[in-house]
A protein has these predicted regions:
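Active-site-proximal helices and loops of the catalytic beta/alpha 8
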Residues: 1-66, 71, 117, 134-165, ...
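Hydrophobic, well-ordered secondary-structure elements that form the walls
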Residues: 118, 130, 163, 200-204, ...
């Protein structure tokens, strides 16, 4: 859904939405600096943690708790450029750049960061066919290319499987509470938790190693606890 969905989600109509405002857009801006159609690049949005959490919290509050918990959280779909193509920070479409350019200078490490967020953020993670295999493409219709049979990125497929297993294994990622914990330039930290389990997710979108002290007590982790 494009725009504020409050009126549709206030009762008697929709249960939830395809979650652009409280997932796809904030994640894309933060990790790539790109607009979701690859129509604009904004350096001021790349790694902007304040904008990320601000957009997420505002739009999640407009949706409400239950719609957020079952929202369709996608990185790509049939209406927008493939997330992997957005990682090249190139503005363009099939008519202006051509098909090959959609695969130039892409960064699969950024896609993996996005998948971690997709599998740990509140909502229902929804993988658009081929994203798990490393498919690229500009916005519609280039985003609807055939599945790359025989050319799949098997390492990326296995990464998706691992993250899906984690999502399924730990209930806190499916129905637990959420809290932002800390953030800085090009990094964010948030928690998912319930009465039995607490999980801390740290996303570092820098080029270098990051060492930070985190107030994880905010989600109920004791001072001398040992994290796996």
């Amino acid at each position: 859904h494009y725009g504020d969905s409050y009126d549709w989600l206030s009762g008697g109509e929709w249960d939830t939405v395809m979650n652009y405002d409280a997932f796809m857009e904030p994640v894309t801006w933060f990790l790539t600096g790109m607009e979701k159609h690859s129509d604009q690049y904004r350096e001021d949005m790349l790694g902007n943690a304040d904008n990320f959490f601000g957009a997420m919290h505002h739009n999640m509050s407009r949706m409400g708790g239950q719609p957020v918990s079952i929202s369709m959280n996608e990185l790509s779909n049939h209406d927008h450029s493939r997330f992997l193509t957005r990682t090249n920070s190139t503005v363009g479409r099939i008519a202006t750049k051509g098909a090959k350019a959609a695969n130039e200078n892409v960064e699969k490490c950024i896609l993996r960061e996005a998948v971690v967020m997709q599998m740990t953020w509140p909502g229902a993670p929804t993988v658009y066919y081929g994203d798990e295999a490393g498919m690229v493409g500009w916005t519609d219709p280039d985003n609807r290319r055939s599945y790359p049979w025989g050319k799949q990125d098997w390492e990326l497929i296995e990464f998706h499987k691992d993250m899906i297993r984690i999502h399924k294994k730990y209930e806190c990622f499916r129905s637990g509470s959420y809290k932002s914990i800390a953030s800085g330039s090009h990094w964010i930290c948030y928690g998912r938790f319930n009465k039995k389990l607490q999980a801390v997710i740290l996303i570092n979108n820098r080029r270098e190693t990051l060492t930070v002290d985190l107030p994880i007590w905010q989600i109920g982790i004791l001072e001398n606890a040992c994290l796996k």
